[in-house]
Amino acid sequence: MKVLILVLLGVVILQAAPIRKLEDLLPTRNPPQNELVYWCTYANQCDFCWECIHGICRNRIQADWPVIHQNDWIINCTVSRWNGICRYYEGPRGHIDHEMDCANPTYHTYPHIEYMKIYVRDDL
């Protein structure tokens, strides 16, 4: 009897709280602010993840990342989402295209972090 009550309760809860599907995102170079953590985790070299002033750049989302010199490692990106598939395009149109399941994202291996030019203050 207890099992039946638990099953019925589970069915009622599932029907009361419908599963939210992520809205589609048309290709953009400026993803919504509330999605920056997601995009900057998996596409961290994209220019929208960095704030650069006078050639010195700080990651806007991940505070533990080093401060770096603005260089070719930071690239223009376009991101999009369609039917649960997240994509980002790096560099010039058609340069590198990475596709992943939005619910089970994966890291892209290019460009490698060793190409970052870490900023070191020499006046300390």
Swiss-Prot record:
Keyword Signal: yes
Superkingdom as given in the UniProt entry: Viruses
Signal sequence extent: 1-16
InterPro entries in the record: ASFV_fam_110 (IPR004848)
Transmembrane segments: none
Glycan attachment points: 76
Keyword Isomerase: no
UniProt keywords, alphabetically: Glycoprotein, Signal
Described function: Plays a role in virus cell tropism, and may be required for efficient virus replication in macrophages.
Assigned protein family: Belongs to the asfivirus MGF 110 family.
UniProt protein name: Protein MGF 110-8L
